[in-house]
């Protein structure tokens, strides 16, 4: 849709693309069809070389198209962008007990924890994230492999340690560290990270 519109040069149809990508009233992948269309709209803007729209103000998808349509223009930084409301706020660097916990009497996970972060609640182990120092001793000691390490895929893939967390728990790029390699983009399972194109 985006390529067809770009090659036709008729940018007036840009506002309709999110409705063509997400037709009807039922969402395809997220909790709301409106959220899906908003995300599709931001992806269209980035595909056209435009910047993300500020979340707190209402702007048209086509806003800024006049400047972006200039053939000799380079993209405006940043190249790699996070659509904030598309971010799923994946857990960041934490150990969690899964349903595989057998509540064994050995309680090796609890015994090896240097901070006393592992407790037993209703016969199953639980990790107090406020006390946990993420050493991984509990996970290594569990004979059932019931303790897993959760890390944001985008953050784990970033070799520059440029992915952080904003005040809402959403992923945020530190552009002073980011080299725009795209590893976060490739590894995000929710499609929240998008690079700019210059169609």
Question: What does each model-identified segment do?
Answer:
Residues 1-157, 161-169, 177, 185-187, ...:
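Ferredoxin-type iron-sulfur electron-transfer modules and their immediate structural context
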């Amino acid at each position: 849709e985006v390529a067809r519109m770009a090659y036709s040069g008729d940018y007036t149809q840009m506002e309709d693309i999110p409705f063509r990508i997400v037709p009807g009233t039922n969402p395809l992948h997220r909790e709301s069809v409106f959220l899906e269309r908003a995300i599709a709209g931001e992806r269209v803007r980035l595909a056209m070389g435009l910047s993300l729209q500020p979340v707190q103000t209402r702007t048209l998808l086509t806003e800024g198209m006049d400047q972006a349509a200039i053939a000799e223009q380079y993209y405006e930084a940043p190249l790699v962008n996070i659509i904030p409301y598309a971010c799923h706020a994946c857990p960041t660097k934490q150990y969690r007990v899964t349903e595989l916990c057998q509540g064994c009497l050995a309680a090796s996970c609890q015994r090896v924890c240097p901070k006393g972060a592992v407790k037993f609640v209703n016969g199953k182990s639980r990790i107090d994230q406020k006390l946990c120092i993420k050493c991984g001793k509990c996970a290594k000691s569990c004979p059932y492999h019931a303790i897993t390490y959760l890390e944001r895929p985008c953050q784990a893939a970033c070799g520059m340690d440029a992915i952080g967390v904003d005040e809402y728990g959403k992923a945020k790029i530190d552009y002073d560290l980011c080299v725009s390699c795209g590893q976060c983009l490739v590894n995000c399972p929710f499609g929240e990270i998008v690079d700019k194109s210059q169609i």
